[in-house]
């Protein structure tokens, strides 16, 4: 509550800013709130439920192991035993996930596919964090990164740590400039990877 009080004081103290600037500040703050990691919540409900809540709160979708249907409504998250619903796939298209929220993924053990499309807050740090998580290094088989303007070669090269990656699509990433070097690095480190590049 004190945090909200401090932020609201800051917002009230800012005067005569253009509406668009004020609005941008507010939405940036709100997105940061949505991404904040609550470690007590992870402990209480388990990593898959807490990560599901985070992802859906930010506008992403999840699919659970053994299910065909994508879960996209925060208010209709399934209930039941904590170990019943394990995240198998994440579609973060048009979501506001950002690096401060990626600690939610630490305990996930069944994620096989991640799609990051038009994620304006995704940066290299997100991919670096993702590739450092030992569970995800083992389980991720497919990734798609599309139209994420803040991603550069540094973030993409970190994906070499995903040692079981079988399919990687990179599309419309203006910050990725060393295509030939990336192709060579992936061929060397992950020879069975199907790498699809749709880059300028």
Curated annotation (Swiss-Prot):
Biological-process GO terms, alphabetical: ATP biosynthetic process; proton transmembrane transport
Report the transit peptide positions.
1-25
- Say if the entry is tagged with keyword Transit peptide: yes
Keyword Membrane tagged: yes
Binding of Mg(2+) occurs at 59, 93
* Stored InterPro entries: LRR_dom_sf
Domain of life the protein comes from: Eukaryota
Q: Which residues form a coiled coil?
A: none
Instruction: Please list which residues make up the signal peptide.
Output: none
Query: Which GO MF terms does the UniProt record name?
Result: metal ion binding
Ranges for the LRR repeats = 62-87, 88-116, 117-141, 142-173
Q: Which UniProt keywords apply?
A: ATP synthesis, CF(0), Hydrogen ion transport, Ion transport, Leucine-rich repeat, Magnesium, Membrane, Metal-binding, Mitochondrion, Mitochondrion inner membrane, Repeat, Transit peptide, Transport
Annotated spans, N-terminal domain = 1-61
Q: Which SUPFAM superfamilies did the record assign?
A: RNI-like (SSF52047)
* Localisation per UniProt entry: Mitochondrion; Mitochondrion inner membrane
A cellular component term, taken from the record's GO annotations: mitochondrial inner membrane
Subunit info?
Homotetramer. Associates with ATP synthase.
User: Function, please?
Assistant: Involved in regulation of mitochondrial membrane ATP synthase. Necessary for H(+) conduction of ATP synthase. Facilitates energy-driven catalysis of ATP synthesis by blocking a proton leak through an alternative proton exit pathway.
According to its UniProt record, which protein family does this protein belong to? Answer: Belongs to the ATP synthase subunit s family.
Tell me the protein's name. ATP synthase subunit s, mitochondrial
Organism whose genome encodes this protein: Pongo abelii
Originating gene:
DMAC2L
């Amino acid at each position: 509550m004190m945090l909200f009080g401090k932020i609201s004081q800051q917002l009230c103290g800012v005067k005569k800013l253009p509406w668009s600037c004020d609005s941008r500040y507010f939405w940036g703050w709100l997105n940061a709130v949505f991404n904040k990691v609550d470690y007590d919540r992870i402990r209480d409900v388990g990593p898959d439920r807490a990560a599901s809540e985070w992802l859906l709160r930010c506008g992403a979708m999840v699919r659970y192991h053994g299910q065909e249907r994508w879960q996209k409504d925060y208010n209709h998250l399934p209930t039941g035993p904590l170990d019943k619903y394990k995240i198998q796939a994440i579609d973060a298209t048009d979501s506001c996930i950002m690096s401060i929220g990626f600690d939610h993924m630490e305990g996930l053990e069944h994620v096989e596919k991640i799609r990051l499309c038009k994620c304006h807050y995704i940066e290299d740090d997100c991919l670096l964090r993702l590739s450092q998580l030992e569970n995800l290094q083992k389980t991720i088989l497919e990734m798609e990164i599309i139209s994420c303007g803040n991603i550069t070669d540094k973030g993409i090269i970190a994906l070499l740590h995903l040692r079981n990656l079988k399919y990687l699509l990179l599309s419309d990433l203006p910050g990725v400039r060393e295509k030939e070097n990336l192709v060579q690095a992936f061929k060397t480190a992950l020879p069975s990877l199907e790498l699809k590049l749709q880059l300028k």
